[in-house]
Each structure stands twice: as structure tokens, then as C-alpha cells.
Amino acid sequence: MFQYISHYTPSIGYIDGIRMALEGGCKWVQLRMKDAPEEEVLACAKEALPLCRQHGAKFILDDHVELVETAGADGVHLGKNDMPVDEARKILGPDKIIGGTANTIDDIIRLHRQGAD
């Protein structure tokens, strides 16, 4: 399964990149908009979600636990400096996907113990 982590370039915006990844067969999209205001992330998520659904792809938000439900996302990816996985699980419940950044075996063990998927 291919995963696409969105990014912005002057020639290809977030949605265009997501669209191209989905058309190329991607089945997992992570909307990553570091330092963007929540309103902008939510607006982009509302545009990306139907594209993901149309292509049968999972849609994951980067960092924004508080926007997952409103955006209709399948889950969230948490970086090492974001909310701990166990706190996010309390907010999102058992049915949402929670992933995290793991660069070492110790990171993997920690994330697993906290309840990451």
C-alpha cells in the first residue's frame, strides 16, 4: 500500500498533489500542513476527504487530533512532540486510526504501549 504525505509547492498545491497520488493508486493520504491555521487545515481536509473516499483511500490528518471528527478523517498521525498517543486515544476512541513517528525500536515499543495502531 502506498502512503502519500501531502506537501505544498508553488506549482502543486495540497489538493492537486493528493489528487495525483490518488489517481496513481495511493490508498493512504496524510494531510500534512505544518504551521497552517486550523481553519485552513479544515478547509483543505473538507476538500481532500471526498477525493479519498472516491478512490477508497484512508484519510489521515497530521497533528490535529481536535479536527479529526469535524473533518471526517479516519485518524491522525502524531509527531514526537505532539499529543501523546494515549491522550489522543481517549479523545478519538477505539475506532479511529492513531499513528506516530517512529525512528527507533524504542519509539515503536513506546507507541505500541500507548495504543498506537
Where are these regions (language model features)?
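Conserved N-terminal beta1-alpha1 strand-loop-helix module at the mouth
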Residues: 1-85, 90-105, 110-117
